[in-house]
């Protein structure tokens, strides 16, 4: 039973992200590099947030449960803000790298666009965030079947898996919207990204009232997904084209007469 719960929750949590990785990232070495580098940036933000929380816990009264709970909420907010700061730092780094790649190419264009970088970096933030948020829970799932014996919810593992899947998708959407907002200097969009991230993090403190946390988080996920889709240039026509497996016709015209070999004398 433990193994079934483990594999089931793992597929729920990381199935969408793994599919996105295989289809859109794994075949391009440059995207893989961006994915790994983005995970490193997220890890640094987590390290700094952990240091801040660790110091605050040890300089305050550890016997005060209410104070420690407040510090936990404060630490989560600091972690969110640091993640967004490092997302911006990663955007700046990728922007410089994009300019360098464009200068080295023969046609003066970068082999990867900013939108593609935004998508891959967001996916990297989401995957590493999901791994750190659910890995201990999945490890416990392999243990003895004690879920719910002490009054805990029997849906703890399953809801944690669905929450992790939502967080991974949200980071992907946040990355697309965040990079586009930086490109167009839309500060209100940056504020909405940070605000929705803080809201999502705050909603997790409502657990184990999963109806009050999971449903709003998925509502935010759907909203951010639509926003990211429109930001990336999506439309109803593009959806219809993808469903019908049609490719956009190339508007360029090749003059074949210019490619003919001149006749020999």
UniProtKB/Swiss-Prot annotation:
The chain crosses the membrane at residues 3-23, 32-52, 69-89, 119-139, 159-179, 187-207, 214-234. InterPro entries: Aph-1 (IPR009294). The keyword Membrane applies. Keywords: Endoplasmic reticulum, Golgi apparatus, Membrane, Notch signaling pathway, Transmembrane, Transmembrane helix. It comes from the Eukaryota. It holds the Pfam family Aph-1. It is a multi-pass membrane protein. It is found in: Endoplasmic reticulum membrane; Golgi apparatus, Golgi stack membrane. Disruption phenotype: Full embryonic lethality. No live homozygous embryos are present after 11 dpc. GO terms for cellular component: early endosome; endoplasmic reticulum; endoplasmic reticulum membrane; gamma-secretase complex; Golgi apparatus; Golgi cisterna membrane; Golgi membrane; membrane. One of its GO terms (molecular function) is peptidase activity. Its main location: endoplasmic reticulum. Residues 24-31, 90-118, 180-186, 235-265 are cytoplasmic. Residues 1-2, 53-68, 140-158, 208-213 are lumenal. One of its GO terms (biological process) is Notch receptor processing. The keyword Membrane applies. Belongs to the APH-1 family. The functional gamma-secretase complex is composed of at least four polypeptides: a presenilin homodimer (PSEN1 or PSEN2), nicastrin (NCSTN), APH1 (APH1A or APH1B) and PSENEN/PEN2. Non-catalytic subunit of the gamma-secretase complex, an endoprotease complex that catalyzes the intramembrane cleavage of integral membrane proteins such as Notch receptors and APP (amyloid-beta precursor protein). Required for normal gamma-secretase assembly. The gamma-secretase complex plays a role in Notch and Wnt signaling cascades and regulation of downstream processes via its role in processing key regulatory proteins, and by regulating cytosolic CTNNB1 levels. This is Gamma-secretase subunit APH-1A.
């Amino acid at each position: 039973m433990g193994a079934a719960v483990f594999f089931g929750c793992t597929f729920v949590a990381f199935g969408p992200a793994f599919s996105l990785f295989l289809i859109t990232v794994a075949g391009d070495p440059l995207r893989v590099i961006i994915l790994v580098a983005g995970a490193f940036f997220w890890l640094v933000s987590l390290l700094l947030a952990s240091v801040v929380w660790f110091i605050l816990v040890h300089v305050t009264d550890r016997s005060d449960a209410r104070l420690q709970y407040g510090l936990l909420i404060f630490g989560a907010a600091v972690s969110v803000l640091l993640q967004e700061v490092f997302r911006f730092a990663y955007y700046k780094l990728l922007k410089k790298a994009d300019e360098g790649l464009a200068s080295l190419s023969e046609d003066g264009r970068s082999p990867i666009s900013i939108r593609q970088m935004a998508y891959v970096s967001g996916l990297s933030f989401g995957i590493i965030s999901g791994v750190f948020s659910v890995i201990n829970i999945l490890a416990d799932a392999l243990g003895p079947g004690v879920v719910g014996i002490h009054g805990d919810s029997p849906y703890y593992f399953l809801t944690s898996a669905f929450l992790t899947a939502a967080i991974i998708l949200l980071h992907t959407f946040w990355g697309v919207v965040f990079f586009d907002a930086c490109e167009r200097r839309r500060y209100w969009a940056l504020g909405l990204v940070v605000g929705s991230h803080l809201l999502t993090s705050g909603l997790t403190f409502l657990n184990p009232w999963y109806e009050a946390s999971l449903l709003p988080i998925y509502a935010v996920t759907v909203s951010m997904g639509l926003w990211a889709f429109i930001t990336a240039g999506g439309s109803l026509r593009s959806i219809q084209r993808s469903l019908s497996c049609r490719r956009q016709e190339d508007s360029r015209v090749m003059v074949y007469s210019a490619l003919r070999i001149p006749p020999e004398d």
